[in-house]
């Protein structure tokens, strides 16, 4: 059993998908999607800190998008910046960067296979991608 829950984040330019672990650290469930505006530096960090405190989270796993050649591109740099902003606001949180290559595509494929409408997919895709990121991390622990 974990001492604290683990949060998974899929950071985009307009949204942050959020997933949370169960207390045993076995499964990831979609929790929320934060609306952000990266261009205006409105990153939802205060809202995220509230979620961390409310759910007794000790570790945050942030998806790190890498190129297929393992280099870090623009979106990867944005995720690293998000990590730094979160650490500034909440220095005691442990943050793990997790290779998220293909997580959004896997989430999209799952939703398509479940015959979820395009409208509904747009609403849940970021949260689902966060679930894939967090579940990958949780699986690596066991």
Swiss-Prot record:
The cross-references to CDD domains, in alphabetical order and at most eight, read: YqgF
Q: Where in the cell is it found?
A: Cytoplasm
Q: Which GO cellular component does the record give, naming just one?
A: cytoplasm
**What InterPro entries would the database entry show?**
RNaseH-like_sf, YqgF, YqgF/RNaseH-like_dom, YqgF/RNaseH-like_dom_sf
List the keywords (alphabetical): Cytoplasm, Hydrolase, Nuclease, Ribosome biogenesis
Q: What is its main location?
A: cytoplasm
SMART domains referenced in this protein's UniProt entry, alphabetically? YqgFc
Gene inactivation phenotype reads: Not essential, it can be disrupted.
What top-tier enzyme class does this entry carry? hydrolase
Q: Which GO terms describe its molecular function?
A: nuclease activity
Annotated family:
Belongs to the YqgF nuclease family.
Protein name, as recorded: Putative pre-16S rRNA nuclease
Natural source organism: Staphylococcus aureus (strain NCTC 8325 / PS 47)
């Amino acid at each position: 059993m974990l001492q604290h829950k683990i949060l998974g984040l899929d950071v985009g330019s307009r949204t942050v998908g959020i997933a949370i672990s169960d207390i045993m650290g076995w499964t990831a469930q979609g929790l929320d999607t934060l609306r952000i505006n990266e261009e205006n530096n409105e990153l939802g960090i205060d809202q995220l800190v509230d979620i961390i405190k409310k759910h007794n989270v000790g570790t945050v796993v942030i998806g790190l998008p890498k190129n297929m050649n393992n280099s870090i591109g623009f979106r990867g740099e944005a995720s690293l910046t998000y990590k730094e902003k979160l650490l500034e606001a909440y220095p005691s949180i442990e943050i793990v960067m997790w290779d998220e290559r293909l997580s959004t595509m896997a989430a999209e494929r799952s939703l398509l296979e479940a015959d979820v409408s395009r409208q509904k997919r747009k609403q849940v895709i970021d949260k689902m991608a966060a679930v894939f990121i967090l579940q990958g991390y949780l699986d690596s622990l066991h």
